[in-house]
Amino acid sequence: MYHNGMQLHLTRRSGMWHLLVSMGNNSTSVLLESSSSTRRRPRWSYIRRHNQVSILLLVGSNLQWLITIFPNMSQILCQTMPLHFTGCQDI
């Protein structure tokens, strides 16, 4: 996927999903934490740009990853969150 001058590509290595972000001559690989339980390729839920920051949401079978890319600082943050709560409450 190409977005605002960045090439975004999902790959699976050693049983874990990685997001490869290429910006010009710079490339960074971001490990999607706990993605070993996600066999299918995570889907792009949304990608937005706010000022100079790009925000991506990837959704797997039981987890989602919020990825914030700061191209001017060459910094990428990745937050892993459960997709939904499946527990039960005592009544």
From Swiss-Prot:
It holds the Pfam family Bunya_NS-S. GO terms for cellular component: host cell nucleolus. GO terms for biological process: symbiont-mediated suppression of host gene expression; viral process. It is found in: Host nucleus, Host nucleolus. Keywords: Host gene expression shutoff by virus, Host nucleus, Host-virus interaction. Belongs to the orthobunyavirus NS-S protein family. Plays a role in the inhibition of the host immune response by interfering with the production of interferon in infected cells. Induces host nucleolar disorganization and host POLR2A/RPB1 degradation leading to host transcriptional shutoff. This is Non-structural protein NS-S. It comes from Bovine Schmallenberg virus (isolate Bovine/BH80/Germany/2011) (SBV).
